[in-house]
């Protein structure tokens, strides 16, 4: 009879402990119900990239002096710089410039070390495409500035996320459609 009482006591303790664990899990669930949703309806709502976001590279053809520093500092020697030497002025003249974004690792070395600042990083991150060969941008495609997410009136921007700094939010305060959850 003593073993039966001991077994019942152990069973009761285990049942109480299981109820505590279920209660703890339920409290976590209730805690998460009070939080704001983190889901972003992507095509219609977009995040504002941070100030130091490294997106697609923008190239200014007129500023480039064809020094090829960008090619030397690139870990994968990606930028293709085609130039010819003008013998009358003894200077290089840029003929073409291209970057394949299907291979680019967006490290930003080319932008950082460019002596004439003809390269810059944009906030464009939508580079998805069906054919990878279309990601090879020449100087004309690199020269196009992307439509800013903030200036596009058809898209709501999400700016009250915790990882954004106050400066980046205040810098974009003139946007028309800001979703506050």
From Swiss-Prot:
Disulfide linkage: none
Role: NDH shuttles electrons from NAD(P)H:plastoquinone, via FMN and iron-sulfur (Fe-S) centers, to quinones in the photosynthetic chain and possibly in a chloroplast respiratory chain. The immediate electron acceptor for the enzyme in this species is believed to be plastoquinone. Couples the redox reaction to proton translocation, and thus conserves the redox energy in a proton gradient.
GO biological process: photosynthesis, light reaction
Cofactors, names only: [4Fe-4S] cluster
Domain 4Fe-4S ferredoxin-type residue range list: 55-84, 95-124
Entry keyword set: 4Fe-4S, Chloroplast, Iron, Iron-sulfur, Membrane, Metal-binding, NAD, NADP, Plastid, Plastoquinone, Quinone, Repeat, Thylakoid, Translocase
Annotated signal peptide: none
GO cellular component terms, A-Z: chloroplast thylakoid membrane
Pfam families: Fer4_7
Name of the protein described by the UniProt record: NAD(P)H-quinone oxidoreductase subunit I, chloroplastic
Superkingdom of source: Eukaryota
EC number in record: 7.1.1.-
Binding site for [4Fe-4S] cluster 1: 64, 67, 70, 114
InterPro entries according to UniProt: 4Fe4S_Fe-S-bd, 4Fe4S_Fe_S_CS, NADH_quinone_OxRdtase_chainI, NDHI
Subunit-structure text: NDH is composed of at least 16 different subunits, 5 of which are encoded in the nucleus.
Gene: ndhI
Record bears the keyword Translocase: yes
Family the entry assigns: Belongs to the complex I 23 kDa subunit family.
Membrane topology label: Peripheral membrane protein
């Amino acid at each position: 009879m003593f073993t039966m009482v001991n077994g019942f006591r152990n069973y009761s303790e285990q049942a109480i402990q299981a109820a505590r664990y279920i209660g703890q899990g339920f409290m976590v669930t209730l805690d998460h119900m009070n939080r704001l949703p983190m889901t972003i309806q992507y095509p219609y709502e977009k995040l504002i990239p941070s100030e130091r976001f490294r997106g697609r590279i923008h190239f200014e053809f007129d500023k480039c002096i064809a020094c090829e520093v960008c090619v030397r500092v690139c870990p994968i020697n990606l930028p293709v710089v085609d130039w010819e030497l003008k013998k009358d002025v003894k200077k290089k003249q840029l003929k073409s410039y291209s970057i394949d974004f299907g291979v680019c690792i967006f490290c930003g070395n080319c932008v950082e070390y460019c002596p004439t600042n003809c390269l810059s990083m944009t906030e464009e991150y939508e580079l998805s495409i069906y054919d990878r060969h279309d990601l090879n941008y020449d100087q004309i495609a690199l020269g196009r500035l992307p439509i800013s997410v903030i200036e596009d009136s058809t898209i709501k921007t999400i700016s009250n996320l915790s990882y954004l700094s106050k400066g980046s939010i205040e810098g974009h305060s003139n946007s028309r459609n800001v979703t506050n959850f």
